C-alpha cells in the first residue's frame, strides 16, 4: 500500500515547480512576497512545499556565507485550529523559530543576546495581545510586561517603549503596526537573506480560522525579506471570505469581491495543473514499482526518472523506459508490476488525474485484491476490478455501480450485455432496451466500450470483494470471516 502523507520523493515531476518558486524567492527584488500554491484537494500542494523547502536548504548549503542564511518556518494551520487565536499562534510560531535559530547558531549572529532579548519582548507582547482578546484589563496586563531595566537593554528603546505604551492602553491596532516595524528591524539586523513561512492545510480550517491566518499574513506581507507560501484550495478560501465579509455582488461587477480580496493578499497565485495522461501513467507506474520492488531497486529507478524529467517534461516514463535504464548485470523481477499495468489505461480515462485520489484508488484496489486472495478468489483480474471500481468512484454515476451489481446478481454473475459494448462504439448508440435509458451518456458509453470487455465474465467474486461500497449490504468484515472460517 501507499502512504497518503506529503513527501519529498518526487514522483509527479513537481521539482520544476519547486525550482521556479525558489528562483522567485531568492530574487531580492521580489521580496517581500506572498505566494498562493493553489490546487484542488490532493493535488500535491504540501509535497510541493516540502520540495521547495528542500530545494532552498540545498541552495543555502551550497552558499556558505554571511548573506545566505534562510530561515524556513512551517505552520500547519489545521493542527492549530482549536487555538483561540490562530493569527497570534502563527505569529508566535515565527518568533519561536527565530529564537530557536539564534540559540542553535549563536556563533553566527552578532549580538545574539540582544537579538534574543528583542524576540522575547515581542513574544511577551503577543502573549499579552492574546489576553487582550479575552477582554482582560490593561492593569492586569502590566504584570506580564518586562521590567524597565530589561527594556533599557534592548536597542531601539523608544520603539519598544511605544510598544509597551500601546499594550498597556489596550491599543491593539497601534500595537500591530509597531510590532510589524519592530519585527522588520529584527529580521534585517539578524542578517537573513529571507524568512520564509509555509502555511499549509489552510483549506481544512473553518472559515473563522482561515480569516485569522489570512490576517496574520496581511500583518507581515510588507515586511522586507519575508515570503509567505500558502497552500490551499482557493475556492474554499474564497468561500471563507464570503462568509466573513458578506458583500452582495453587483450586476456590473466583472469579478467577485471575494476573489479581489484574495488577490490583494496573494501577490503570486501559482496553480498546480491537473496531471496529463502521460504524467498519470508515469505516476501510477512508479507507485507500482515502489510497492512491489525492494527499496534499493526502486531508488535506482526513481533516480533515473528524475534525470529523465530534467530534459523531458512531456513524455511518459513507462515500464519500457524503466527497463531500458536498468544495468545489464542487474536482474529485477517486474512481474508483479507488469501484472497490474493493464489498470493504467482505465484509470487514465475515467479518473480525474488527482494524485491523492489516484493513490487512494490504488490502496482500495490493493485491499480488495488482498481480500480476494484471502477468500480464495485466484481468478480476480486487476483490470476487470478496476473497470468496475471507476464507476463506484464517480459521484455522478456510482448508482450505475449498484445497477451493475443487481444485473449480474439476477443473471448468475454474468451481465446481459449481448451487443451493448459494440453498440456503445457506434454513432447510433445503445439500442438494447435494457441498457438504453440509463447508459447512453457519453461517459457511460465510453465506459462500456473500453477494455477490458466484461462480456461473459462472471462478476460475482468481483462484487463480493467490493460489497463494502454497496448500500444495505452486510459489513465486509463479517463476509470475510464467514468465507475463511
Regions inferred by a protein language model and the residue ranges of each:
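The feature marks long, low-complexity, polar/acidic/proline-rich intrinsically disordered regions embedded
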Residues: 1-15, 19-31, 35, 43, ...
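Conserved P-loop NTPase "ATPase switch" module shared by AAA+ and STAND
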Residues: 192-207
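Conserved NTP-binding/hydrolysis module of P-loop NTPases
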Residues: 84-101
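Conserved P-loop NTPase catalytic core
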Residues: 249-286, 290
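Short hydrophobic/aromatic beta-strand immediately N-terminal to the Walker A/P-loop
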Residues: 34-38, 74, 198
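Sensor-1/coupling segment of RecA-like P-loop NTPase cores
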Residues: 221-253
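Switch/connector loops and helix/strand junctions flanking conserved nucleotide-binding motifs
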Residues: 45-46, 82-86, 236-242, 278-282
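A short hydrophobic beta-strand->loop->alpha-helix junction that borders the nucleotide-binding pocket
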Residues: 73-82
Amino acid at each position: 500500500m501507499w502512504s497518503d502523507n506529503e513527501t519529498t520523493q518526487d514522483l509527479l515531476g513537481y521539482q520544476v515547480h519547486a525550482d521556479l518558486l525558489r528562483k522567485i524567492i531568492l530574487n531580492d527584488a521580489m521580496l517581500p512576497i506572498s505566494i498562493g500554491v493553489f490546487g484542488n484537494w490532493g493535488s500535491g500542494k504540501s509535497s510541493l512545499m516540502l520540495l521547495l523547502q528542500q530545494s532552498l536548504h540545498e541552495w543555502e548549503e551550497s552558499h556558505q556565507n554571511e548573506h545566505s542564511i534562510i530561515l524556513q518556518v512551517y505552520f500547519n494551520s489545521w493542527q492549530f485550529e482549536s487555538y483561540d487565536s490562530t493569527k497570534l499562534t502563527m505569529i508566535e510560531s515565527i518568533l519561536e523559530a527565530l529564537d530557536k535559530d539564534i540559540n542553535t547558531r549563536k556563533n553566527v549572529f552578532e549580538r545574539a543576546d540582544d537579538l534574543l532579548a528583542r524576540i522575547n519582548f515581542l513574544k511577551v507582547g503577543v502573549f499579552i495581545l492574546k489576553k487582550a482578546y479575552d477582554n482582560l484589563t490593561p492593569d492586569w496586563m502590566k504584570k506580564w510586561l518586562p521590567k524597565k531595566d530589561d527594556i533599557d537593554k534592548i536597542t531601539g528603546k523608544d520603539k519598544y517603549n511605544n510598544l509597551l505604551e500601546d499594550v498597556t492602553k489596550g491599543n491593539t491596532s497601534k500595537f500591530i503596526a509597531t510590532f510589524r516595524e519592530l519585527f522588520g528591524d529584527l529580521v534585517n539586523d539578524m542578517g537573513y537573506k529571507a524568512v520564509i513561512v509555509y502555511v499549509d492545510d489552510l483549506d481544512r480550517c473553518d472559515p473563522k480560522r482561515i480569516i485569522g491566518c489570512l490576517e496574520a499574513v496581511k500583518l507581515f506581507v510588507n515586511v522586507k525579506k519575508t515570503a509567505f507560501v500558502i497552500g490551499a484550495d482557493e475556492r474554499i478560501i474564497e468561500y471563507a471570505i464570503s462568509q466573513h465579509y458578506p458583500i452582495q455582488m453587483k450586476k456590473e461587477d466583472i469579478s467577485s469581491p471575494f476573489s479581489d480580496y484574495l488577490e490583494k493578499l496573494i501577490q503570486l497565485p501559482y496553480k498546480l495543473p491537473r496531471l496529463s495522461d502521460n504524467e498519470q501513467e508515469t505516476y501510477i507506474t512508479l507507485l507500482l514499482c515502489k510497492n512491489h520492488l525492494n527499496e534499493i531497486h526502486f531508488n535506482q529507478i526513481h533516480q533515473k526518472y528524475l534525470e529523465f524529467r530534467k530534459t523531458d517534461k512531456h513524455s511518459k516514463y513507462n515500464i519500457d523506459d524503466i527497463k531500458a535504464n536498468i544495468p545489464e548485470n542487474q536482474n529485477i523481477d517486474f512481474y508483479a508490476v507488469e501484472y497490474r499495468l493493464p489498470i493504467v489505461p482505465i484509470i487514465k480515462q475515467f479518473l480525474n488525474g488527482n494524485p491523492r485520489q489516484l493513490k487512494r484508488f490504488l490502496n482500495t484496489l490493493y485491499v480488495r485484491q488482498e481480500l480476494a486472495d484471502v477468500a480464495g478468489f485466484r481468478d480476480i483480474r486487476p483490470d476487470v476490478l478496476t473497470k468496475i471500481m471507476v464507476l463506484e468512484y464517480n459521484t455522478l454515476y456510482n448508482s450505475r455501480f449498484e445497477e451493475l451489481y443487481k444485473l449480474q446478481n439476477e443473471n448468475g454473475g454474468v451481465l446481459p450485455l449481448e451487443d451493448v459494448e459494440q453498440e456503445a462504439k457506434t454513432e447510433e448508440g445503445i439500442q438494447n432496451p435494457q441498457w438504453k435509458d440509463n447508459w447512453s451518456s457519453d461517459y457511460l458509453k465510453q465506459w462500456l466500450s473500453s477494455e477490458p470487455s466484461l462480456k461473459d465474465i462472471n462478476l460475482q467474486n468481483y462484487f463480493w470483494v467490493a460489497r463494502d461500497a454497496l448500500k444495505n449490504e452486510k459489513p465486509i468484515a463479517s463476509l470475510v470471516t464467514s468465507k475463511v472460517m
